[in-house]
Amino acid sequence: MTEQATKPRNSSHLIGGFFGGLTSAVALQPLDLLKTRIQQDKKATLWKNLKEIDSPLQLWRGTLPSALRTSIGSALYLSCLNLMRSSLAKRRNAVPSLTNDSNIVYNKSSSLPRLTMYENLLTGAFARGLVGYITMPITVIKVRYESTLYNYSSLKEAITHIYTKEGLFGFFRGFGATCLRDAPYAGLYVLLYEKSKQLLPMVLPSRFIHYNPEGGFTTYTSTTVNTTSAVLSASLATTVTAPFDTIKTRMQLEPSKFTNSFNTFTSIVKNENVLKLFSGLSMRLARKAFSAGIAWGIYEELVKRFM
């Protein structure tokens, strides 16, 4: 099998990213909604917000903008990430082949190029920052649609209100905090994810490790390795970047009060407490961990299917 034959087509990353992102967004929307509502009020608790929900369907409020943002964003991000990582791997002549055991002894669960930890960190951060800017308007609409501070009845009403009150800048409100959260998160995530895929096969019980006739892992084994790696990596990266998520949410919900990232940070620390910077972490942790497991598990397998 030649390098050209083993190289995934670019469209496979768009398709894999889109469906992985869409599935995780719809399935985990309740966690995202609860996280937003906990962060908007310094006295809010999970139990208090759950009691205010009149019907289970209300937990999926804001699903459309969330699904659009996550599916489109995931497709663009993973395509952009693959383009950068493949370009770097080509230059170093390090694109792995499923038939070259010396190259893939630690990453037989994946068909993605293998880079250094430093390269994984930088490509993940840069790709996320770029795509985050492109999808920022959808993010702002999504956050406000989920919040109880705005009672939008439709996406059209949300768009009209934001544009009328704040102009085009309103659709990019909180981008600085979002970028400070997402770029480090993505960089850390890709670094940890790729390293976990190398290490997990070495520590998993032998009953979980099965090989196909070509020498790579079976679908069961690769899915186990990739999904577990995604959950572990997302959990750690989410915890580290949690304060930026709280700052971003406050800026998008109360733009007149919180005008910039530093002002928001000092206000929370001074008027509330440092722990409030981690408000909603349990919801975000659960959502990001499961989301990464679902999205990256689907993405990795679809990429291999479209090779």
Curated annotation (Swiss-Prot):
Bilayer-crossing regions: 14-39, 62-88, 121-146, 174-197, 225-251, 280-298
GO molecular function: glycine transmembrane transporter activity
Catalytic activity, as annotated: glycine(in) = glycine(out)
Family recorded in the similarity comment: Belongs to the mitochondrial carrier (TC 2.A.29) family. SLC25A38 subfamily.
Function of the protein: Mitochondrial glycine transporter that imports glycine into the mitochondrial matrix. Plays an important role in providing glycine for the first enzymatic step in heme biosynthesis, the condensation of glycine with succinyl-CoA to produce 5-aminolevulinate (ALA) in the mitochondrial matrix.
HAMAP family: SLC25A38
Miscellaneous comment as given in the Swiss-Prot or TrEMBL entry: Present with 1550 molecules/cell in log phase SD medium.
Protein name: Mitochondrial glycine transporter
Native species: Saccharomyces cerevisiae (strain ATCC 204508 / S288c) (Baker's yeast)
